[in-house]
């Protein structure tokens, strides 16, 4: 609670966290690839796909939970994704699904950006980059929180990267 008040104050009341074995919520991936794209496909679709054998930017043929939600009349236009890694538009298949995905250093596709969103989009690439295809988690976090505050979506997927990337160093 003290270290991560957002989790304690917001997610505990309005969201869900999966993968806390102490709470009986165990998540176990079954794909045999043990790297990013196949793993995220499995997390977002609910099943492993043995045909996904790389992290290449290839549009996912599988429908994610985000796409299924966006196709539901109660969620249509109220689903979004904010991801640090620039491959997520392909994993989520933003073109087919209609789910807006802010990932990597791509700009938001909105004509009504807040001052903070415009600031982040203009300046996020002006600091030294640790990888050219991964946005710093701070920017992903700010953009996602600003979206939640201003657009009141019903479902938001947020994927940070630094704990993964920096653990490989």
Model-inferred region functions:
Residues 3-7, 36-40, 61-68, 75, ...:
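Stable alpha-helical elements in mature extracytoplasmic
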Residues 94-96, 142-169:
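Active-site His/acidic residue clusters
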Residues 28-31, 50-57, 128-134, 146, ...:
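Second-shell loop/turn segments in exported
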Residues 25-28, 49-50, 85-90, 162-166:
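Solvent-exposed loop/turn segments at secondary-structure junctions
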Residues 13-20, 72-79, 150-156:
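Loop/turn elements at helix/coil->beta-strand transitions in domains of secreted/extracellular proteins
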Residues 47-125:
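Catalytic-site neighborhoods of secreted/periplasmic enzymes
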Residues 18-22, 32-39, 43-49:
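A short aromatic-anchored loop/beta-hairpin motif
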Residues 2-33, 80:
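Short, structured active-site-proximal loop/turn typified by the sulfatase FGly-forming signature C/S-X-P-X-R
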């Amino acid at each position: 609670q003290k270290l991560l008040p957002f989790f304690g104050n917001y997610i505990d009341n309005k969201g869900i966290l999966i993968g806390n074995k102490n709470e009986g919520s165990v998540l176990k991936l079954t794909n045999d690839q043990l790297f990013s794209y196949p793993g995220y496909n499995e997390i977002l679709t609910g099943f492993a796909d043995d045909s996904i054998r790389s992290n290449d930017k290839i549009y996912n043929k599988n429908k994610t939970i985000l796409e299924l939600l966006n196709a539901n009349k109660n969620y249509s236009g109220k689903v979004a994704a904010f991801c640090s890694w620039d491959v997520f538009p392909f994993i989520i298949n933003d073109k087919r699904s209609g789910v807006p995905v802010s990932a990597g250093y791509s700009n938001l596709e909105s004509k009504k950006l807040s001052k903070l969103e415009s600031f982040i989009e203009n300046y996020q690439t002006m600091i030294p980059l640790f990888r050219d295809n991964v946005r710093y988690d701070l920017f992903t976090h700010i953009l996602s929180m600003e979206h939640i505050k201003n657009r009141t979506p019903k479902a938001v997927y947020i994927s940070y990267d630094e704990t993964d990337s920096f653990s490989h160093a």
